[in-house]
């Protein structure tokens, strides 16, 4: 009897309930049919080395992410929840994924060159070996307050002709997660999508805050149609930002301020507050519950605590629901009244 070969794709399908739960914890939803289509067809046709049977290799996942997060019309915002869930399974694997992880790469450190050992000096019992005396050091004089000395730590260096030296190294940045590293690398290249990352785990699993920059907001606004023209496209963009960046409450307001008009923001917030769940899971009409779950003024949510992160996760989900609700625009009756039946046209 033949044996069924287990692949990363078939493994995720066998544990689909856990995959969906993992995606839900990140604030997104994934569907099995699209999960299979992306893995077996669309990501394979990107020609970046993605195998049809799937993989938990971070190198392959990063190559697919570059295509998905490409700016403007070249990206695929609708695929963000799926590749983000793949990465989550690879970076924080459950027990059933660990046997299928690729082996870690060996360190690429170069071997230290062998330096010849100095030969021992010839000694003799007739002549004692005298220790070598260090050359005399010049005396350290206290600075003369009247002398025009330059403080090299505070003065700017003089201009040099033709920069041929190595570029100056920038300040060291705190350690961030693989997604944060990927997004920050793209920020160095202005031709690619902006890479702000408001909230990610740093050293000791403590969240660190990276605010949006003006260039991030400008690129998102200039490379995408307005909400009134194509609400679905802009909603997909904002969804990808909410998933990958995990913004705080203030960041969400800044994002809405940059991408939506005042009237559009009011519609989105109104639709989102209609979806606030009550104790039974259905939308509630209790003002205190609505204000606590989806506040219009800055809440006292600490993203460094589990409770604060849970508040932010639910807030981002409701904000996305508000965007989808506001995208369903009502019929403009004024435009309907402008339609006049022609003389040769039938009422049908």
Swiss-Prot record:
Residues 97-208 are annotated as: Disordered. Keywords: Capsid protein, Host cell membrane, Host membrane, Host-virus interaction, Lipoprotein, Membrane, Myristate, RNA-binding, Viral budding, Viral budding via the host ESCRT complexes, Viral matrix protein, Viral release from host cell, Virion. Residues 120-132 have a biased composition (Low complexity). A lipid is attached at residue 2 (N-myristoyl glycine). The keyword Membrane applies. GO terms for biological process: viral budding via host ESCRT complex. A motif (PTAP/PSAP motif) lies at residues 118-121. One of its GO terms (molecular function) is structural constituent of virion. One of its GO terms (cellular component) is host cell plasma membrane. This is Gag polyprotein.
């Amino acid at each position: 009897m033949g044996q069924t070969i287990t692949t990363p794709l078939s493994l995720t399908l066998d544990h689909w309930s856990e995959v969906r739960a993992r995606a839900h914890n990140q604030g997104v939803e994934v569907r099995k049919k699209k999960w299979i289509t992306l893995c077996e067809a669309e990501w394979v046709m990107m020609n970046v080395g993605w195998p049809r049977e799937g993989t938990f290799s971070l190198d392959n996942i990063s190559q697919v992410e570059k295509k998905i997060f490409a700016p403007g019309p070249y990206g695929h915002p609708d695929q963000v929840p799926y590749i983000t869930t793949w990465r989550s399974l690879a970076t924080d694997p459950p027990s059933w994924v660990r046997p299928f992880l690729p082996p870690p790469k060996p360190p690429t450190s170069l071997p230290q060159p062998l330096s010849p050992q100095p030969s021992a000096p010839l000694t003799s019992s007739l002549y004692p070996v005298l220790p070598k005396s260090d050359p005399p050091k010049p005396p350290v004089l206290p600075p003369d307050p009247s002398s025009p000395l330059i403080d090299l730590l505070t003065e700017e260096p003089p201009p040099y002709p033709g920069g041929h030296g190595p570029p100056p190294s920038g300040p060291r940045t705190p350690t961030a997660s693989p997604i944060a590293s990927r997004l920050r690398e793209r920020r160095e290249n202005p031709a690619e999508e902006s890479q702000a990352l408001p909230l990610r785990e740093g050293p000791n699993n403590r969240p660190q805050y990276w605010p949006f920059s003006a260039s991030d907001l400008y690129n998102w606004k200039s490379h995408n149609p307005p909400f009134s023209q194509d609400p679905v496209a802009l909603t997909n963009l904002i969804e990808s930002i909410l998933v990958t960046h995990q913004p705080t409450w203030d960041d969400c307001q800044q994002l809405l301020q940059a991408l939506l008009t005042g009237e559009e923001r009011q519609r989105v917030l109104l639709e989102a507050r209609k979806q606030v769940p009550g104790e039974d899971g259905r939308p509630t009409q209790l003002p205190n519950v609505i204000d606590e779950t989806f506040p219009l003024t800055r809440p006292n949510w600490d993203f460094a605590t589990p409770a604060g992160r849970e508040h932010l996760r639910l807030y981002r989900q409701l904000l996305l629901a508000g965007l989808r609700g506001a995208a369903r625009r009502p019929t403009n009756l004024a435009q309907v009244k402008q339609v006049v039946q022609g003389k040769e046209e039938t009422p049908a």
